[in-house]
Regions:
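An alpha-helical interface "stripe"
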Residues: 1-189
Length: 189
């Protein structure tokens, strides 16, 4: 019996998501696994994200950012003396990324209201301390499908976004020329 392979955009999304997360959104829904906070990915897997967790104004996945910061830097966060830590940190983070770029901010972190926050722990070598290995394992890589992103155009979506600790690193707009989808025809986001 000959079977046809799925070559559409959604099938490609499924393959990518299954490879990174371990399951697809549809598989999780069918199994009743909808609690995003109950995830415990192993060292080879990513968290799965929800489009609603993106703060569209500041372009940050709030769930992953704050989960990472609260898990890895609780003592530093306790130094905060202002009135709204999430707004102040997220606003300054967005400004730092806009000014210095994502890579520099991930490497160096940033300071806000007497706190020095790290946003990524680099992969240690085998000779590095146990603490370095633990910190690296606390990074939260995540993948979100069908990510809405615009305050001005609420229906606009990007096929997939890959985040590290809530900060978007890569966006994927999948196109399949076999089905007539091309960047030239469908436009750029």
């Amino acid at each position: 019996m000959i079977t046809t392979s799925k070559t559409n955009e959604q099938a490609f999304e499924w393959l990518i998501e299954r490879a990174l997360v371990g399951s697809t959104k549809e598989e999780r829904e069918a199994a009743g696994l909808t609690d995003v906070d109950a995830q415990q990915p192993d060292a080879q897997q990513y968290y799965w994200g929800l489009p609603k967790d993106l703060d569209k104004k500041w372009a940050v996945d709030m769930r992953r950012l704050w989960s990472f910061l609260e898990t890895t830097q609780k003592e530093e966060l306790e130094k905060y003396t202002g009135s709204d830590i999430k707004t102040e940190v997220t606003k300054l983070l967005s400004k730092e990324i806009e000014t210095f770029g994502v890579i520099k901010v991930l490497r160096e972190g940033f300071e806000v209201n007497n706190m020095k926050l790290k946003l990524f722990f680099p992969k240690p070598s085998a000779a590095d301390s146990t603490l370095s290995h633990v910190k690296y394992s606390q990074n939260q890589f995540s993948l979100t499908r069908q990510q809405t992103y615009s305050v001005l155009k609420p229906g606009e979506e990007i096929d997939m976004v890959l985040y590290v600790n809530g900060i978007p690193l890569f966006t994927f707009e999948l196109k399949n020329p076999w089905t007539g989808q091309t960047a030239k025809y469908n436009g750029k986001k």
